[in-house]
């Protein structure tokens, strides 16, 4: 093939490169929207606007389509809380299998904590009409089937179905699994989940090799929760709901002074928790796990991280690369799509630390200016087919959270890719990802990489980039195809 002159890239670039950007998943940003201030009395029914899906216009609002009024201050979302389908696409199953096998090759066992929905757990809070419409048996059956699919791929999967159809006596204090007007579980929900997860972890062969430690949990105060569902109702209807107050808990090593850690072996936990904001400190899920499992846990989850935020940040860290855990607990909810290619391309690249310590097929170091910047050009016509290669781009400024790039190929095709890290994450300025291999992309030969520079007037950005041979992980031989049936 005749090599395309680099200047030809500029001609091709005249087409709208911003179209078709492969946006990375944005998790539900639970704590971003502040509670609006209203003077209305607490309400007991939603306005008509809340029942019309067309009024949920922004990406964030669409996570709440559409709100349903339940008993008292309880609200539910029809698409997420009252879903009856739990599934992904064939490509999603294929990628989940590859991810499991890659972790297994690194000596890491993955435990999947697949949360039951609010509808499955708290359906008895629905009003009679909505409860009759919600096919609980179908939802529970499909949820349990999905747990089985994860297990068939080789994941360790605690069965959380006993937590469903909760019926707490009214005379007891409010220890509900979920908040009335928020998608997060309460600390009591986190605790009940942790007990089941811990029982499963203790059955794993790896558990026997992990140093044990006793923990105890104490009530540490109260938190006021202005729920995300309540906030959305306020935006759509101008109504307000009462703040829900809930016990908070902290977990500490049993009988140890505050400086006891200096002399313990807890500096290198062999269990790590990655996950969503459900694993944040407000709900003490990590603490309850430590108490129930009886071992130190490194919690790297953060609010607003979504499905992949904390996982990607952790895989690129020294903690994972230098001392990978024996057990990795991955907590996420069914609302996240499991077939997002850009996420897997990053995780698979970072599992073996991208291009770190590998021979670079191409490399460059430059300062980005506003607009498009030609970063790498395959001027010697090397064999850089997608199936065998990955990209590792590092900004000198660790606070850079967005990479917008165009990958050009020898036959004139191109891919626009956009990777956005959560604003809440403590980032490292690094973006590593495999070249695209879905559909018919595996045989494409890379010509050039263009990267979008800073906004006009902003400081220039220093960046380094490498192309190297991608990681090859042995397949685990699980029955992926059967899982997707």
Curated annotation (Swiss-Prot):
<feature type="region of interest" description="CBM domain">
    <location>
        <begin position="356"/>
        <end position="482"/>
    </location>
</feature>
<comment type="similarity">
    <text>Belongs to the AlgX family.</text>
</comment>
<dbReference type="GO" id="GO:0016746">
    <property type="term" value="F:acyltransferase activity"/>
</dbReference>
<dbReference type="GO" id="GO:0042597">
    <property type="term" value="C:periplasmic space"/>
</dbReference>
<keyword id="KW-0574">Periplasm</keyword>
<dbReference type="InterPro" id="IPR031811">
    <property type="entry name" value="ALGX/ALGJ_SGNH-like"/>
</dbReference>
<dbReference type="Pfam" id="PF16824">
    <property type="entry name" value="CBM_26"/>
</dbReference>
<comment type="subunit">
    <text>Monomer.</text>
</comment>
<feature type="active site">
    <location>
        <position position="182"/>
    </location>
</feature>
<keyword id="KW-0732">Signal</keyword>
<dbReference type="GO" id="GO:0042121">
    <property type="term" value="P:alginic acid biosynthetic process"/>
</dbReference>
<feature type="active site" description="Proton acceptor">
    <location>
        <position position="184"/>
    </location>
</feature>
<keyword id="KW-0012">Acyltransferase</keyword>
<feature type="active site" description="Nucleophile">
    <location>
        <position position="277"/>
    </location>
</feature>
<dbReference type="Pfam" id="PF16822">
    <property type="entry name" value="ALGX"/>
</dbReference>
<comment type="function">
    <text>Plays two roles in the biosynthesis of the exopolysaccharide alginate: protects alginate from degradation as the polymer traverses the periplasm, and also plays a role in its O-acetylation. Probably has acetyltransferase activity in vivo.</text>
</comment>
<feature type="region of interest" description="SGNH hydrolase-like domain">
    <location>
        <begin position="30"/>
        <end position="355"/>
    </location>
</feature>
<feature type="disulfide bond">
    <location>
        <begin position="355"/>
        <end position="468"/>
    </location>
</feature>
<dbReference type="InterPro" id="IPR031798">
    <property type="entry name" value="AlgX_C"/>
</dbReference>
<dbReference type="InterPro" id="IPR038639">
    <property type="entry name" value="AlgX_C_sf"/>
</dbReference>
<comment type="pathway">
    <text>Glycan biosynthesis; alginate biosynthesis.</text>
</comment>
<keyword id="KW-1015">Disulfide bond</keyword>
<dbReference type="InterPro" id="IPR034655">
    <property type="entry name" value="AlgX_N"/>
</dbReference>
<keyword id="KW-0016">Alginate biosynthesis</keyword>
<feature type="signal peptide">
    <location>
        <begin position="1"/>
        <end position="30"/>
    </location>
</feature>
<keyword id="KW-0808">Transferase</keyword>
<feature type="disulfide bond">
    <location>
        <begin position="47"/>
        <end position="237"/>
    </location>
</feature>
<protein>
    <recommendedName>
        <fullName>Alginate biosynthesis protein AlgX</fullName>
        <ecNumber>2.3.1.-</ecNumber>
    </recommendedName>
</protein>
